[in-house]
Amino acid sequence: MNCVYIENLTAYFPNINFEEISDSNFFIIDILQNEHKHLKSLRIKPNEKILITNGQGIVAFAMMELIGKTNYKIRINKIIKQFNELPFRLGLAIGIIASKERFEFAIEKCTELGVTDIFPIISDFSQTKNINYERIKSKTIAAITQCKRSCLPQIHQPISTLELIELVTVQGSAYYFDSIILADENGIYPTSNLKNSKNIIAFIGSEGGFSERELNSFPAQTIKWNLGHRRLRAETAAILTIGILSL
């Protein structure tokens, strides 16, 4: 079943009670083709079932009723909130990688695995400090339609490692995470058994890892994970770590 992204989905039914929608109590929305050209590229046919995500916590189970010359008529059969989302907040703090393609690949795959917050970090060894926000957002949109989830991750502005460590350790703040994972060769072997954690953030360094100054700034309760004997690229370490945490 194809999944499509329509950011303004709820604008088509502002006064609908989601709980009352069903196969026998459906409604039709009318979408202009020139506003959603990506639907045409999917070659969806009449009577084909599709999923629609708005990236803001809603997925609609739908069916293509009619493909007109200028519009689509889509039948909405059911709406589910927080579809295919993890039961906890999962952050990825990853050093900005010099290769934009590798950096964007890491973000795309970690989005598929359920990450909710992305923090591009400027570490002492970072070779670049800038990101292309629009390109990264487009990668996350592609990822949530691939894995059929309801929420886009929040992409935060680039921040230094030390500043982010300070933010995520302040209880009560919007940035607070109660568990910090650090990819480190001196750590323990990973486990996904963090049942008491409601918010987990994983720190992955860029090329060269983290400096001694940065490593010494992590709080004592930081959980260090050894990701194996082989030296991994930053994007591989990010995907592996988030994959374990999402299990």
Task: Explain the meaning of each model-derived region.
Residues 83-179:
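RNA substrate-binding interface of SAM-dependent RNA methyltransferases
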Residues 155, 180-182, 222-226:
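Conserved beta-strand scaffold positions in the cores of enzyme catalytic domains, especially
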Residues 1-81, 134, 177:
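N-terminal positively charged helical leader segments and presequences
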Residues 184-196:
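Strongly charged, low-complexity linkers/loops
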Residues 28-30, 87-91, 200, 218-227:
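Glycine/charged-rich beta-loop-alpha catalytic/anionic-binding loops adjacent to active sites
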Residues 197-213:
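A C-terminal functional module that forms or caps the active site or interfaces directly
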Residues 212-247:
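Structured adenosyl-cofactor binding patch, chiefly the S-adenosyl-L-methionine
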